Regions:
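Short glycine/acidic-enriched loop and turn motifs that connect beta-strands
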Residues: 57-61, 111-112, 160-161, 208-210, ...
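Beta-strand-rich domains and repeat architectures in extracellular enzymes and scaffolds
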Residues: 29-57
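Blade-level signature of beta-propeller repeat domains, shared across WD40, Kelch, NHL, RCC1
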Residues: 330-363
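Blade-edge motifs of beta-propeller repeat domains
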Residues: 17-34, 68-86, 117-135, 166-184, ...
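Hydrophobic h-region of N-terminal signal peptides that target proteins for export
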Residues: 8-16
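Solenoidal tandem-repeat scaffolds enriched in leucines and small polar residues
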Residues: 135-143, 147-163, 183-209, 213, ...
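Beta-propeller blade termini
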Residues: 37-46, 89-98, 117, 138-147, ...
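Hydrophobic beta-strand segments that make up the repeating blades of beta-propeller
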Residues: 52-57, 104-108, 153-156, 202-206, ...
Length: 363
């Protein structure tokens, strides 16, 4: 979207009777030339508000950027993340060395993945590489996967071997364990205790017509499938969508409708609900309670189509549209950027401005 459009009007989207989404002239990140794949949110400089790391490049080398929140939800100051240009698909903010501040992990396409450690003030210094030069990393997922109190990383490598990198207790990822098949076309991994045994499990979204899997911790050998067995999935998130106490799986698909697979006490995911367009081009999906009514809602980012969010009342999903008509949204992230307790949406748009949609009270 051109900057002139931002300067001439504020586009408001009806979220519910008492909420709106609002685009502000200052609520954009990067340039309209960046090939942004995703964003991540967290308080990097310890000032109490959420900052944003933007993952740029995809297959082409660009610099990743860190945008610092001014306390009001605007991002006028930014720095490069490292000196290099990289082919980055994903960044994550997480405290990997248990020192109380957020560090940054970077997942790259056919370049080794990177770790940047934080000095507590938002100064991010390259620490070490992990992974392989030839890996097509598309997703990173962090959780304590072996129960030692430190954050590990599961890496989704499209058309290659997926790996878990275990934290050595000092924020280093040298110990690698492969899991799954040698040629899984994994794009995204979500971590959750799907079977309630106290260990984290890994939920995969695979493309290229491959089955989607759940790998059960702590060994990550036992697995089950969910979905049709031949989906073109791009993203996955996990939450209790119907309030029955069981975790459900929400998956984004290309060329088909997006799906919710409801968990049962038996550990199966046979009951499902389709939502979205029959020929969806959804690349990103994220769950959050947008209207703070106690139910988990869904935000989807589409390529070449308008984006949507779905408000959940446990019986049905109410669909709303937002974003550009022909934008290429590769990522959506959700968090309270302006400190009003309502979650805002950040869209990562390849070849366009990255846009913040503020969740506001109507005037």
């Amino acid at each position: 979207m051109r900057i002139s459009l931002f300067l001439t009007f504020v586009f408001q989207l009806v979220l519910a009777q008492d909420r709106i989404f609002e685009v502000h002239p200052y609520g954009r990140l990067g340039t309209d030339k960046n090939l942004t794949a995703s964003t991540s949110l967290g308080d990097l400089d310890g000032d109490g508000d959420m900052d944003i790391v933007v993952a740029n490049g995809r297959h082409w080398s660009e610099k990743n950027r860190v945008f610092f929140n001014d306390g009001k939800g605007f991002f006028r100051r930014s720095i490069s993340l490292g000196a290099e240009r990289n082919t980055t698909y994903v960044t994550l903010m997480v405290d990997i060395d248990n020192d109380g501040d957020l560090d940054v992990l970077v997942g790259n396409d056919r370049i080794r993945n990177q770790v940047f450690k934080n000095d507590g003030s938002g100064n991010l210094v390259f620490d070490h590489y992990f992974g392989f030069q030839t890996s097509n990393t598309r997703g990173l997922c962090t959780a304590d996967l072996n129960g030692d109190g430190f954050v590990d990383v599961a890496v989704a490598n499209r058309q290659g071997q997926n790996y878990i990198y275990f934290n050595n207790g000092k924020g280093n990822y040298a110990d690698a364990q492969p899991f799954g098949g040698p040629k899984e076309a994994t794009i995204t991994i979500a971590a959750a205790d799907m079977d309630g045994d106290g260990s984290m499990d890994l939920v995969l979204a695979n493309r290229d017509g491959q089955p989607n899997y759940i790998y059960f911790g702590s060994k990550f050998v036992k697995k089950i499938t969910y979905g049709t067995g031949s989906d073109e999935s791009r993203d996955v998130d996990v939450g209790d969508m119907d309030g029955d106490g069981q975790l459900d799986i929400v998956v984004a698909n290309i060329g088909d409708r997006n799906m919710i697979y409801y968990g049962s006490k038996k550990g199966s995911y046979d009951r499902s609900k389709a939502f979205g367009n029959p020929a969806a081009a959804t690349h990103s999906i994220m769950l959050a309670d947008l209207d703070r009514n106690g139910n988990i809602d869904i935000v989807v980012g589409n390529k070449g189509q308008r984006n949507h969010y779905y408000l959940n009342n446990k019986k049905e999903l109410m669909k709303y549209t937002f974003g550009q008509k022909d934008g290429d949204t590769y990522g959506v992230t959700i968090g309270d950027l302006d400190g009003d307790v309502y979650p805002d949406i950040v869209t990562a748009n390849s070849g366009g401005w990255n846009i913040i949609y503020y969740n506001r009270t109507p005037k």
